[in-house]
């Protein structure tokens, strides 16, 4: 008998951590929008992480233009110095968010409570 289950789980971004990351990105001069937390986000490898622990999978724009991901135009934009700058600022924002999680008990608690609320019970039983 062959049994299968999804290789990648759907994503459950942890809104309290996403909001903290957004604030940290603003501190380094990068504006960003957060998606509606009621939306479905599709599956990916980070989904497998997000069903176990609070996680984020936010997006930063590398250009002011709307360019489809995984396209030749996106590859060209990713090779520009502006994209490198966004990557560096993104790393700064992630580091700041990690530090916030280490130092801020209320953020950790909010993340844990949110995670418990949004991840379906059938994942918790595995």
Language-model features: where?
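Metal-dependent amide/peptide-bond hydrolase catalytic core
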Residues: 1-126
């Amino acid at each position: 008998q062959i049994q299968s289950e999804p290789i990648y789980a759907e994503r459950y971004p942890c809104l309290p951590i996403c909001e903290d990351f957004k604030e940290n990105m603003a501190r380094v001069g990068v504006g960003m929008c957060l998606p509606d937390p009621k939306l479905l986000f599709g599956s990916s490898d980070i989904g497998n992480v997000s069903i176990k622990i609070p996680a984020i999978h936010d997006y930063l724009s590398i250009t002011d233009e709307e360019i489809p991901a995984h396209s030749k135009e996106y590859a060209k934009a990713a090779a520009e110095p502006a994209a490198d700058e966004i990557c560096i600022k993104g790393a700064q924002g992630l580091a700041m968010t990690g530090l916030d999680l280490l130092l801020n008990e209320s953020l950790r608690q909010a993340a844990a409570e949110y995670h418990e609320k949004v991840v379906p019970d059938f994942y918790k039983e595995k």
